UniProtKB/Swiss-Prot annotation:
The chain crosses the membrane at residues 273-293, 523-543, 576-596, 611-631. Its EC number is 7.6.2.-. The gene is macB. GO terms for molecular function: ABC-type xenobiotic transporter activity; ATP binding; ATP hydrolysis activity; identical protein binding; polymyxin transmembrane transporter activity; protein homodimerization activity; transmembrane transporter activity. The lineage of its organism: Bacteria, Pseudomonadati, Pseudomonadota, Gammaproteobacteria, Enterobacterales. Disulfide bonds: none annotated. Keywords: Antibiotic resistance, ATP-binding, Cell inner membrane, Cell membrane, Membrane, Nucleotide-binding, Translocase, Transmembrane, Transmembrane helix, Transport. It is a multi-pass membrane protein. Residues 1-272, 544-575, 632-648 are cytoplasmic. This is Macrolide export ATP-binding/permease protein MacB. It holds the Pfam family MacB_PCD.
Length: 648
């Protein structure tokens, strides 16, 4: 009869400083299907090391070990995990149940790594627990179960994938005598069902219940009676076979990994929340700065547009502050007419201004009087609360009419409901009020100077008595480049004057400068916020590294029941990403709350969230989870299962 487990000259040594300590010294052993074997020996005899090699948790330094004729030395880590998953079931002295899972969920774990569908897995777990007398304890956590009940859950887990070979390490060592007898009775039943049962113990009474007792001392077998030949041995229940297609198996495996990650995080709620806090603050900072910064930029640009966008101002002289008399009369009315004829000009308004006194009854105030055309108010985005602007007839006839700003109206007519038609003195000239213009509120504040507007012809001819203009404002048509229009305007006036005795000021240039400045400032603030996100990511990595250390034994348990290194890597990586994703969602929620609060206090601001910004936030949190979760996950996947199981 061919042995199920065959060991030939197995040696296992470990480094101890500069030397090698040999724990197993040429072990040769055959174990047949259906046997109940006890391996006994004192502490330090090498029996646990032998069990680890038998269960494919450890590899021999030299020698040959075959499982059902297959040489274990030729298998890689994933193939060894498959071998453990399909052939072996482990029963540990300390049960090694996962504390955050129920009895039923603990039993399901091996089948999760076997890729069994959830429904089949659940039915099998319930069936095994019922067979072991725990049908009313399926939803209990390990802490709610007695030692004997926990060991029965451990046995059910060992049988989940078939458990052709049951490896029991001191199965009664942590139990009272009654519970120990129950566990041994179950092991006898498993032997009777065809399972191969290997018990590692130092208790002679437990060993005596086996059909064959193998004694090991100082790494050598000192007693190995011949196996009792068995007939009609089925080799235990057949291994669980996964018939699910590759794609469905991948999706199912990912969903299970996600579920396990969520359970692990939920088991330490406070720590998970504190870990998320860095991500929450980081994402909220990034999103808030981007969104609020964009709203502030739009507000600034709107203020600049309210002054007049796509406009070019022309002034006499070389530059601002130039009061040279030879340039004072550089701009003429003929220049205005020539400019208005250009194809790229939407409108052009002249401006002549002077500080004058305004009088109405016994009220006397100082104001800036400006001579303009009717287009002036459209150019600067001004609206009328009362009346209207000048018409062409009033411009041509030098009509004695005036438009007030809202501050002037309040000073001159504090108690009048309608001021259109009232007559005031502008300097010494009577003028009838035809409108009240409302200037757009600016975040830069309003001017303290009272302002009134008259037709430029009236201002020049009747008030100031001058034939030249103080400035000309040109509005460029939509679709024309403002910089190109400025160059053409400069060429036109230079040709007309025979020299360049004027200078221009392009509002579009100011707009671009402000856009660049706000974009730079927003980028700087975003980088500061990203730093907080990186700090949050480092916090996630730190906690995950601590988690790997704390859960080392859990990792060992998962590997013992058949988890591959990639399964462990996936689980811890998903945990890190899950922390960051949930933190990202909470961070976005916090940023929405911040935006809503700001909207209440700053009603003029238009704060909005684009789908792209939200998508980028989620992408950012996912990338953070992957980047900062990779190192802890890799460390977890690289753990040796024997060392992991031995860790307390």
């Amino acid at each position: 009869m061919t042995p199920l487990l065959e060991l030939k000259d197995i040696r296992r040594s470990y480094p101890a400083g500069d030397e090698q300590v040999e724990v197993l010294k040429g072990i040769s052993l055959d174990i047949y299907a259906g046997e109940m074997v006890a391996i006994v020996g004192a502490s330090g005899s090498g029996k646990s090391t032998l069990m680890n090699i038998l269960g494919c948790l450890d590899k021999a330094t030299s020698g040959t070990y075959r499982v059902a004729g297959q040489d274990v030395a030729t298998l890689d880590a994933d193939a060894l995990a498959q071998l453990r998953r399909e052939h072996f079931g482990f029963i540990f002295q300390r049960y090694h149940l996962l504390s955050h899972l129920t009895a039923e969920q603990n039993v399901e774990v091996p089948a999760v790594y076997a890729g069994l569908e959830r429904k089949q897995r659940l039915l099998r777990a319930q069936e095994l627990l019922q067979r072991l007398g725990l049908e009313d304890r399926t939803e209990y956590y390990p802490a709610q179960l007695s030692g004997g009940q926990q060991q029965r859950v451990s046995i059910a887990r060992a049988l989940m994938n078939g458990g052709q070979v049951i490896l029991a390490d001191e199965p009664t060592g942590a139990l009272d005598s009654h519970s120990g007898e129950e566990v041994m009775a179950i092991l006898h039943q498993l032997r009777d069902r065809g399972h191969t049962v290997i018990i590692v113990t130092h208790d002679p009474q437990v060993a005596a219940q086996a059909e064959r007792v193998i004694e090991i001392r100082d790494g050598e077998i000192v007693r190995n009676p011949p196996a009792i030949e068995k007939v009609n041995v089925t080799g235990g229940t057949e291994p669980v076979v996964n018939t699910v297609s590759g794609w469905r198996q991948f999706v199912s495996g990912f969903n299970e990994a996600l579920t396990m990650a969520w359970r692990a995080l939920a088991a330490n709620k406070m720590r998970t929340l504190l870990t998320m806090l860095g991500i929450i603050i980081g994402i909220a900072s990034v999103v808030s700065i981007v969104v609020v910064g964009d709203a502030a930029k739009q507000m600034v640009l709107a203020d600049i547009r309210s002054i007049g966008t796509n406009t070019i101002d022309v002034y006499p002289g070389k530059d601002f502050g130039d009061d040279d008399p030879q340039y004072q009369q550089a701009l003429k009315y003929d220049d205005l007419i020539a400019i208005q004829k250009q194809p790229w000009v939407a409108s052009a308004t002249p401006a002549v201004s002077q500080n004058l006194r305004l009088r109405y009854n016994n009220v006397d105030v100082a104001a800036s009087a400006n001579g303009v055309s009717g287009d002036y108010f459209n150019v600067y985005g001004m609206t009328f609360s009362e009346g209207n602007t000048f018409n062409q007839e009033q411009l041509n006839g030098r009509a004695q009419v005036v438009v007030l700003d809202s501050n002037t109206r309040r000073q001159l007519f504090p108690h009048k409901a309608d001021v259109v038609g009232e007559v005031i003195l502008v300097g010494n000239m009577p003028a009838r009020v035809i409108g009240v213009a409302e200037e757009k509120q600016s975040m830069f504040g309003s001017s303290k100077v009272l302002r009134v507007w008259l037709p430029y012809s009236t201002m020049s001819g009747r008030v100031m008595g001058q034939s030249w203009l103080n400035s000309i404002t040109v509005r460029v048509k939509e679709g024309f480049d403002s910089a190109e229009a400025e160059q053409q305007l400069t060429r036109l006036l230079s040709l007309r004057h025979g020299k360049k005795d004027f200078f221009t000021w392009n509002m579009d240039g100011v707009l671009k400068t402000v856009e660049k400045t706000t974009r730079t400032l927003q980028l700087f603030l975003t980088l500061v916020a990203v730093i907080s996100l990186v700090v949050g990511g480092i916090g996630v990595m730190n906690i995950m590294l601590v988690s790997v250390t704390e859960r080392t034994r859990e990792i060992g348990i998962r590997m013992a029941v058949g988890a591959r290194a990639s399964d462990v890597l996936q689980q811890f990586l998903i945990e890190a990403v899950l922390v960051c994703l949930v933190g990202g969602a909470l961070g976005i929620t916090l940023s929405l709350l911040i935006a809503f609060t700001l909207q209440l206090f700053l009603p003029g601001w238009e704060i909005g969230f684009s789908p792209l910004a939200l998508l980028l936030a989620f992408l950012c949190s996912t990338v953070t989870g992957i980047l900062f979760g990779w190192l802890p996950a890799r460390n977890a996947a690289r753990l040796d299962p024997v060392d992991a199981l031995a860790r307390e």
